[in-house]
Curated annotation (Swiss-Prot):
Intrachain S-S bonds: none
Region named Disordered: 88-125
Record keywords, A-Z: Leucine-rich repeat, Repeat
SMART domains assigned: FBOX, LRR_CC
Record bears the keyword Repeat: yes
Gene behind this protein: FBL4
Residue ranges of every copy of the F-box domain listed in the record: 5-52
Name under which the protein is recorded: F-box/LRR-repeat protein 4
UniProt repeat feature LRR, residue ranges: 53-79, 124-149, 150-175, 178-200, 201-227, 228-253, 256-277, 278-303, 304-329, 330-355, 356-381, 382-407, 408-433, 434-459, 460-484, 485-510, 511-536, 537-562, 563-588
GO biological process: nucleotide-excision repair; response to UV-C
Length: 610
């Protein structure tokens, strides 16, 4: 009977709350909260996480949220993310006039004036100590708090937060100009703190860090510091002396030397994850790390000027549990150092070599011979690595699932055939500007790697239609990027459309020989397509788009700049036919006023003024 909701009235509140708990995405929870007023009132009890971007008057916004959501344990404030507000100006067309002196008009005028004055004041769109105090009062049970680039938060607000939110376990202050007093308060009151991020906190010194470390010594497990000139070895010495449970350490600083890292190695024997960009640290410190940090599982080193094969040998000798190794721009590490790691750390599962110009074929061969558990390999800007390196990977690393190759001019089809035949569990293959890789290697991948779901072949000039035909026959791809592969034409993309019905992401930008026919095939064969990049495709027209969107109703993003065959009619077709569309990248002159009114929020314009 109309007006009577018999089923909903019989549902207990516990069951409705359980429904909300099982909904993972925020849009789904929002949709279910609109079932009725009862569901809307109950939905707030299921929320445990809030994410807030830069918006007008965030201090007031925090107060409003605290009154609605009562069980929040995680709050993420990121002021790098802007939140656009709906326009408060009156609509130009009105069916019924209103007196400008009416109460509602007066309220609207005040709100508009307040908005415009706030736009002139930078602080109005930034969280301040007042808002942080409101957050502390409204969410005293919070456990995880991220304040990313909140420049108007100071020690005053942080002190208030620390006193109220004593259950805090994770605190991220990246880019906040807080001082030592606030950090000391966190150390005094937040005795359960486990994770702390102090990246780009320029107002901090050793004094505040030491106070926090001493106060949270029994709980602290993770510390991150970057670009803080006044945080030195003294802070690390305190960490080594007090934080016996420390497992994760991220350091990016030219003011940290061997003394500080040695102190950490001597005191923090549970250290598992070490990520460093410290130009002043030398092999001496890594000798201590290798000898004392026997639980180390992840090591990432960036732009080291005094780290050599000697340090690598120390790690290989002592850190037998190492599973993840990243070396980026470490110019003084050679094949000998990587061989020492391979021989000593046989549990390696992931290796990334980026711009280390002295590492060549022999180092990667050693990984292939000694590390059978390897699952991911990334070789970026490695000009001295040749085919035989990946031949050894194919022979010895049968569990390899992910392979990244960027600007590796010495790797060609011989290497890819070896990978295809030996690493049949390969799931992701990303190749960019490897000009010796062509059809033969990719055909072999399609023939042998049946589990492949992601394939990226960007600017690989020798890859053509035959390669994609083999992939379409052998693999059920979900993501494909062939941007800049100029030998690929309609036949290759058609083969993918017919052979990969699970495809969700496709990038065919900068392909000069692609026309409308593949888009029609994609519409018929790939109904799950969500992301499409067509930019710089000169032969695609509105007709192709029309065929595509008739069946691809899940499309969320479409990039189509520099496509002369696409007009304002094609843009209108995309935004009107795809109910889930979130972003369309196009030249501004191709968007009509009607399309702007209908879907202005999803249109992104190519910047032409650069």
């Amino acid at each position: 009977m109309r007006g009577h909701d018999r089923i909903n009235n019989c549902l207990p509140e516990e069951l409705i709350l359980e429904i909300f708990r099982r909904l993972e995405s925020k849009p789904n929870r929002d949709a279910c909260s609109l079932v009725c007023k009862r569901w809307l009132s109950l939905e707030r009890f299921s929320r445990t996480t809030l994410r807030i971007g830069a918006s007008f008057s965030p201090d007031d916004f925090i107060s409003l949220l605290s009154r609605r959501f009562l069980y929040i344990t995680s709050i993420h404030v990121d002021e790098r993310i802007s939140v656009s507000l709906p326009s408060l100006s009156p609509s130009p067309k009105r069916k019924r006039g209103r007196d400008s002196s009416s109460p509602s008009s007066s309220k609207r005028k005040k709100l508009t004036d307040k908005t415009h004055s706030g736009a002139e004041n930078v602080e109005s769109s930034s969280l301040t100590d007042t808002g942080l105090t409101a957050l502390a009062n409204g969410f005293p049970r919070i456990e995880n708090l991220s304040l990313i680039w909140c420049p108007n938060v100071s020690s005053v607000g942080l002190c208030s937060l620390a006193q109220k939110c004593t259950s805090l376990k994770s605190l991220d202050l990246q880019g906040c100009y807080v001082g030592d007093q606030g950090l000391a308060a966190v150390g005094k009151f937040c005795k359960q703190l486990e994770e702390l991020n102090l990246r780009f906190c320029e107002g901090l010194t050793d004094v505040g860090v030491i106070d926090l470390v001493v106060g949270c010594s029994k709980s602290l497990k993770s510390i991150g510091v970057a670009a803080s000139a006044k945080i030195t070895d003294l802070s690390l010495e305190a960490v080594g002396s007090h934080c016996k449970l420390l497992e994760v350490l991220y350091l990016d600083s030219e003011y940290i030397h061997d003394k500080g890292l040695i102190a950490v190695a001597q005191g923090c024997h549970r250290l598992k994850n070490l990520k460093l960009q410290c130009v002043s640290v030398t092999d001496v410190a890594f000798a201590a790390v290798g000898e004392l940090c026997t639980s180390l599982e992840r090591l990432a080193l960036y732009s080291f000027q005094h780290f050599t094969d000697k340090g690598m040998r120390a790690i290989g000798k002592g850190s037998k549990k190492l599973k993840d190794l990243t070396l980026s721009d470490c110019y003084f590490v050679s094949c000998k150092g990587l061989e020492a790691i391979a021989h000593g750390c046989k549990e390696l599962e992931r290796v990334e070599i980026n711009g280390c110009h002295n590492i060549g074929t022999r180092g990667i061969e050693a990984i292939g011979k000694s590390c059978p558990r390897l699952k991911e390999l990334a070789l970026l800007y490695c000009q001295r690595i040749g085919n035989s390196a990946l031949q050894e990977i194919g022979k010895g690393c049968k569990s390899l699932e992910i392979l990244h190759l960027v600007d590796c001019s010495g790797i060609g089809d011989i290497a890819m055939c070896s990978i295809a035949k030996g690493c049949r569990n390969l799931k992701k293959l990303h190749i960019r500007r490897c000009y010796e890789i062509g059809n033969k290697g990719i055909i072999s991948i399609g023939k042998h790697c049946k589990s492949l779901t992601e394939l990226s072949l960007r600017f690989c000039d020798k890859v053509g239609n035959k390669a994609l035909i083999a992939i379409g026959k052998g693999c059920s791809l979900q993501q494909l990027n062939v941007s800049g592969c100029n030998q690929i034409s309609d036949a290759g993309i058609t083969a993918i459309a017919r052979g990969c019905p699970q495809l969700t992401h496709l990038d065919i930008s900068v392909l000069q020989n692609i026309g409308d026919m593949p888009l029609a095939e994609l519409g018929e064969g790939c109904p799950m397509l969500k992301d499409l990049v067509l930019s710089h495709c000169h032969h695609i027209t509105d007709n192709g788009l029309n065929h595509l969107v008739q069946k691809c109703k899940l499309l969320e993003t479409c990039h189509m700049v520099y496509c002369p065959g696409i007009t304002s009619a094609g843009v209108a077709t995309v935004v009107s036919s795809c109910p889930h569309i979130k972003k369309v990248l196009i030249e501004k002159w191709k968007v009509t006023e009607r399309t702007t009114r209908r879907a202005g929020s999803v249109i992104s314009y190519l910047c032409m003024d650069l």
